[in-house]
Amino acid sequence: MRLAVFGGSFDPPHNGHLALCLYARELLQVDRLVISASNNPLKDAPQAADRDRVKMAELLAETINRTGAFAEVSSWEANRGHPVYTIDLMEYLEEIYSTSDLTLLIGEDNFLNFRQWKSWEELIRRYSIIVFGRKADDGASDDSAISERLHDQSFRHIDLNLPLSSTEIRKRLASGDDCSAEIPSPIWQYIVENQLYQ
């Protein structure tokens, strides 16, 4: 089985995350996608509670699976109660799924600090890594920095051209903006019903 792993804060998940997952299903020839709501040691703590982020990740998986079972959510990271390193997650999933054919999917915002990750060289050695970019007018995509880090063949870069950011969405939600066009409908409904990010 070829497994793709997509970890993130998902605070909240948005249409860019959905597009990345659908791209993985249609074009990367992977059999299964595992979505993991994480606590990134290199970022500020998530605003939403772990249980809410896991639930929103589950709603993201349900949205993906409407057109065929493909995605599932691992709550292993969130249940640990502290930040977990990507190498630990990958090794855990290798054991659970009895496969070493894992592909790590990451957004370019995380990729820019990839060399700060624990055991980053081991990640390159053991796994395929695909970096998804989001071109943006606000400078969120730094082509020179991306190119510098993509000089070897350890990474594949795919530009989705979807300039969506959970950080910006949280700011807009806190201001009372309607972000329903940027967030999958079931997740938007969950945010509204649970009064998240107000």
Curated annotation (Swiss-Prot):
Record carries keyword Transferase: yes
Gene Ontology terms, MF aspect: ATP binding; nicotinate-nucleotide adenylyltransferase activity
Top-level taxon: Bacteria
Single GO biological process annotation from the record: NAD biosynthetic process
Keyword flag Lipid metabolism: no
NCBIfam families cross-referenced by the UniProt entry: cyt_tran_rel, nicotinate (nicotinamide) nucleotide adenylyltransferase
Name of this protein: Probable nicotinate-nucleotide adenylyltransferase
Species in which this protein is naturally found: Chlorobium phaeobacteroides (strain BS1)
Organism classification: Bacteria, Pseudomonadati, Chlorobiota, Chlorobiia, Chlorobiales
Gene name, Swiss-Prot/TrEMBL: nadD
